[in-house]
């Protein structure tokens, strides 16, 4: 299945450690489009790129969905830019895991004010 690879650390930190799946094209609102989306996503995956449409993001809150959408945009742009110097390089799995663990550690601390 095509995808945007995990070549930006933030993808791993925001629930996309294997990258962003790409759903095949289907006309907007048609059963084919819905079937392609369902076939492309897995539990816990908060985004999918819809071929010939754009990104579809879903998360616990609208704020997190917007954040993940920005991360997907950053990864797509990084992939395009990297194409001019040989192509993007995926982050090794152990480093993706470390990035996610670090993000979870930060989140568990909550917001602190000075």
Ranges and model annotations:
Residues 1-114:
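Glycine-rich flexible loops
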